[in-house]
Amino acid sequence: MIIRTADALGIDGIILSGSCDLYSPKVIRSTMGSIFRTNILIENDTEKLFSMLSENKVTTSAAVIDKDAFDVTKCAFEGLQAIFIGNEGNGLPKDIAERCDRRIIIPMHGSINSLNAAMAAGILMWELKK
């Protein structure tokens, strides 16, 4: 779902780390061909990833559930951007969030305090493209 949404919104690429098998038949089917039109990098080495992003002057944001994080709807996304999204069970690891340039949150109403990863990714990618 994330890959398909990225393709639909014209996101430049996706970086995966420690995720499911990208080339499993189920994943390929669910992307409806987007897997073949989207730039995808698999990088499990955090040091290497942050070094690469820094060298390319990419601003990094950590999607977190934290009242002190910046409201994503009020963020200015200028230049190259990378948003880190954690998994649904544990969220983004603390060490990754702390290395990012800023922490962002999707504002939610009522008693809802989190979304599944695909839904959060879709909202965040939409905000990037505004």
Feature map (PLM): residue ranges:
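RNA substrate-binding interface of SAM-dependent RNA methyltransferases
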Residues: 1-70
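Structured adenosyl-cofactor binding patch, chiefly the S-adenosyl-L-methionine
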Residues: 8-9, 19, 27-35, 94-130
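Detector for Asparagine
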Residues: 39, 44, 56, 87-90, ...
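Short flexible/disordered coil segments
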Residues: 55-57, 77-85, 123-130
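Active-site/ligand-binding-proximal alpha/beta "capping" segment
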Residues: 61-112
